[in-house]
């Protein structure tokens, strides 16, 4: 499975790509590995295709020890959010950046276009709260990297 995830990029493609592609690439790759070949257009791999724009921002933490999370249900129920999850457990010690160990959460967002995706991203991003025992926010401010760079960055946050 790691080989499959590595070839797809390892960023929740099992959730984000089926509505974009109209099939499930993970299932196609596994089917091909098991049978020697797999046709992505085969009906058993087909899913409903959704028009619009998508984003899968990954969130990372600063150094510290995770004490608390907030906003899970609020973010999961936010219009346009297909999936959201915190990935670290309470008590996890975060060291200097080395690899994806600091990956703390992810979002899968869908909207009618990139302007709407950016709006949803900004509104949800500011509700993600990962703190240490002193209440210090551990989430790295990487929002600017997650926004569509082709758009003006003046979308309201509330």
Residue spans for each PLM region:
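Short intrinsically disordered coil segments
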Residues: 19, 71-77, 122-126
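Short proline/glycine-enriched turn/loop segments at secondary-structure junctions
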Residues: 43-48, 73-75, 94-98
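Generic C-terminus detector
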Residues: 89-158
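Active-site lining segments that contact anionic ligands and/or coordinate catalytic metals
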Residues: 51-56, 79-83, 101-104
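Active-site "cap" helix and flanking loop/linker of ATP-utilizing ligase/carboxylase catalytic domains
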Residues: 4-69
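Glycine-rich active-site loop/lid that clamps phosphate-bearing ligands
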Residues: 59-93
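Generic structural signal for individual residues within well-ordered alpha-helical segments
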Residues: 27, 76, 115-118
């Amino acid at each position: 499975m790691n080989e499959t995830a590595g070839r797809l990029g390892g960023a929740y493609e099992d959730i984000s790509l089926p509505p974009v592609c109209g099939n499930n690439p993970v299932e196609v790759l596994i089917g091909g590995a098991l049978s020697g070949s797999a046709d992505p257009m085969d009906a058993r791999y087909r899913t409903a295709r959704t028009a619009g724009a998508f984003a899968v921002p990954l969130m990372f933490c600063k150094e510290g020890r995770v004490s608390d999370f907030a906003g899970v249900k609020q973010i999961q129920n936010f219009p346009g959010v297909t999936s959201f999850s915190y990935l670290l457990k309470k008590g996890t010690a975060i060291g200097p950046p080395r690899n994806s160990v600091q990956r703390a959460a992810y979002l899968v967002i869908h909207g009618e276009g990139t302007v709407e995706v950016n709006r949803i991203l900004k509104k949800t991003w500011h509700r993600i709260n990962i703190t240490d025992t002193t209440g210090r926010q551990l989430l790295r401010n990487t929002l600017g990297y997650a926004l569509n760079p082709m758009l003006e960055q003046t979308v309201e946050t509330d």
